[in-house]
From Swiss-Prot:
Keywords: Ribonucleoprotein, Ribosomal protein, RNA-binding, rRNA-binding. One of its GO terms (molecular function) is structural constituent of ribosome. Belongs to the universal ribosomal protein uL6 family. PANTHER family: 60S/50S RIBOSOMAL PROTEIN L6/L9, LARGE RIBOSOMAL SUBUNIT PROTEIN UL6M. The lineage of its organism: Bacteria, Pseudomonadati, Pseudomonadota, Gammaproteobacteria, Candidatus Pseudothioglobaceae. This is Large ribosomal subunit protein uL6. The keyword NAD does not apply. SUPFAM superfamilies: Ribosomal protein L6 (SSF56053). The gene is rplF.
Length: 181
């Protein structure tokens, strides 16, 4: 049995969870998120606690079903946090002349190329640039926030010799020593 799926999720006040046969909808102060439910998983809501169980009785298939239940439980917890608090990722630009500027729904990046990069933001994502070298990405959907952060970082990932590039704020760049003559 999955240790993750065993622990129930307490639904905070102000969050409404609706479960149908194959779809879960979570509504909170930031909006609404939906998630599909695997057919072998049963989710029950008793006294504002969500518990997860499986419908499979065959011993061979139970391990996979419990893995699915654990994943569903983790994703549900992410949905609940997304509609109550939201998710955020912070990026920093390291390098001479590296700058970020937000203009409406477009993030303008100057990363040492001969041209500026204009990144169009997807729906449900907001970006702030408190300084020219910091980017804060916010949104309800954890996957979408992480995807946008990864796409922005991919324009110029940190290089190991000088450490220049776009880094996550808590990322440790492994530095290499320059070639000796």
């Amino acid at each position: 049995m999955s240790r993750v799926a065993k622990s129930p999720i307490t639904i905070p006040t102000g969050v409404e969870v609706t479960i149908t046969s194959n779809l879960m909808s979570v509504k909170g102060r930031f909006g609404q998120l939906n998630m599909s439910i695997h057919p072998c998983i049963v989710i029950t809501n008793t006294n504002n606690k969500l518990s997860f169980d499986i419908t499979i009785t065959e011993k061979k298939e139970q391990k996979k079903a419990w893995a699915q239940a654990g994943t569903a439980r983790a994703n549900t917890a992410n949905l609940i946090q997304g509609v109550t608090e939201g998710w955020e990722k912070k990026l920093t630009l390291i390098g001479v002349g590296y700058r970020a500027k937000v203009m409406e729904r477009v993030l303008n990046l100057t990363l040492g190329f001969s041209h500026p990069i204009n990144y169009k933001l997807p729906e449900g994502i907001t970006v702030e640039a408190p300084s020219q070298t910091e980017i804060i990405i916010k949104g309800m959907d954890k996957q979408k926030v992480g995807q946008v952060a990864a796409e922005i970082r991919a324009y110029h990932p940190p290089e190991p010799y000088k450490g220049k590039g776009v880094c996550y704020i808590d990322e440790q760049v492994v530095r290499k020593e320059a070639k000796k003559k």
